[in-house]
Amino acid sequence: MGGMAKKKHEKGAGSTPATVQLEKAGVPFKTYEYAHSNDHMDDGYGVEAATKLGFDEHQVFKTLMADTGSERVVGVVPVSGHMDLKALAAAVGAKKAAMADPKVAMRESGYVVGGISPLGQRPHHKTVLDESALQYDEILLSGGKRGFSVGVNPNDLLKVLDAVAAPIGTW
């Protein structure tokens, strides 16, 4: 056992910067773990999570990082869709946005691709959640590593991230 005390949360849950941020904010959340494999990589990590955890793909969200030219911003959209970069730029008051290089996204977020969470990033980035999330009591997103998701109320997520909701998802 290490010298750091762990706060108690759902059985089997690992501690990541994402779960630490939720705990510190007092936000209720659930953790979901699944065996990550490379079999789903044509579909993406989020589709794998939805399939293995038995959730609708519209209720499971992926975290994508974009570059507006002056800053990096985070978009959180359903795994079943894509991110509208023009809409993301508009939501943060920028003229345009382009997808960040995966290596940049890993360095800027502190997470590996397939495990990037909008929570617990260092430094914090402006975050936009697709407004479709607001129809659910719980959405799933990466908990900070592959095979580990957190379930959280989208309104709680907006508050803890100081994020905005906007129509940034496309299907």
Q: Which stretches of residues belong to each language-model region?
A:
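Extended, low-hydrophobicity, polar/charged segments
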Residues: G2-W171
